[in-house]
């Protein structure tokens, strides 16, 4: 009887071992390195830092279908993060044409170059965003994302710009965002949104001549404050930035009643890739041990 039981255990163990071995052999090997994406040179109009991004949250928000309130805030957060260092630079002042409008964002051709650069970077990470139609792209047309340079804005409540555009020093109101915008929950987003109110343009502004222009400049100053946060610490702030962008740019409420999405709606957020890598790494260690548990059990039974 004991001999028969031993033979049965050996047979079961051999079958389990062959199954585990075959699964391990067919499992694809994941590379440890992330392919680098070429960064735009100084001479090109659009300079995005996309060398090490894996665009956490974009697939969840945009991969299946295009929904403005779900997809656009995540896309905008990653585009602002990639453009952050360039946006905060103050180039040497150049003579501007008399016909130029200081309230305008980056020129359309330049914005399109940024869109093309971002889309190419997304494709290298196997992320394909659906296009609304043949004449409308997801980023510029559908989401309406526009990039600005700090030198094109007048945000005295947010940045002190020295004469000659040599330095842009963040005000206390902007530095306060570091404390108020660390939590991406509904309550944290609401706190951050309240702190951003202090960056709005008050009264007259030398770069705006209409009430509509002042409102647009106020929103752009708030977006530049969020851009400064992303330049300071993208990993810590990009989830909250995407939540706040949803309230500022894609909320169904009127502009003066911007509200963050309740936690119950479970809206997707932009998440730094490192967080995904850490969680995957910890779980992969666990799953790597699981296939060998049946073998350990067989050996234990055999020794009884």
Swiss-Prot record:
Any Gene Ontology CC annotation:
plasma membrane
Keyword list (alphabetical) reads:
Cell membrane, Glycoprotein, GPI-anchor, Lipoprotein, Membrane, Signal
Give the sugar-modified residues.
133, 160, 183, 233
> How does the UniProt record describe the way this protein sits in the membrane?
Lipid-anchor; GPI-anchor
Region entry Disordered: which residue ranges? 91-111
Instruction: Write the signal peptide boundaries.
Output: 1-22
Give the residues carrying a lipid (GPI-anchor amidated serine). 282
Keyword Secreted among UniProt keywords: no
Task: State the name under which the record lists this protein.
Answer: Uncharacterized GPI-anchored protein At4g28100
Does the record bear Cytoplasm in its keywords?
no
Q: Which residues form the propeptide?
A: 283-304
Species assigned in the record: Arabidopsis thaliana
Compartments (UniProt record): Cell membrane
